[in-house]
C-alpha cells in the first residue's frame, strides 16, 4: 500500500475504532446512572457522561466527516463520482455536524457550561482518570511510547483550560472564539487515552 494511502486508511481506522470506544465509555456511564447502587456513584457517572456527551457528538461527527473525505481521496478521481457512493457518504456525514446541535453549539456547551461554569471540576475529574491510568503503566516498557505523550497532553489540556478561562474573564468573546478548537483538542486527547487503554489490554 502506498504510504500516503496507508496514512489515510489508518486515520479512518483510528477515528472509527477510537470513536467506538468513546461511545462505549459514554454508554457505560449511562448504564451506571440508571443502575448505580449509591448516589455518589450515580452522580460521578452522570457528571462524566455530561462531560463526554458534547465531545462524543461533535468531535466524532467532525471526525466522521474527515474520514469520509479521506475515503474520497483514497479512491482518487473515482471517489468524486456517484458510482462508488463516496460523495453521498460525504454529504451524509456532513449533516451529522449540523443537526442535534451544531459543532459550534456543542463546543460552547463543553467549554462554557461543562468546564468553565464548574471551575474546571468536570475536566479535572476526567484528567484524574487519565493521570491514574498513566501512573498505572509506569515501568511498562511497551506502554511507555503511549503513556508519556498522553501524560503531556493531559497536563496541557488543563493548562489550556486555565489560559482560556483567564482570558475569558477579561474578554467574554474568548469562549466563543476558542470553543471549537478546544472541543477538537478534547476529542483528540480523549481518543488518545482510549487508544492507550486499548493498547494496554
Label every model-predicted segment.
Residues 1-201:
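Flavin-dependent oxidoreductase catalytic core characteristic
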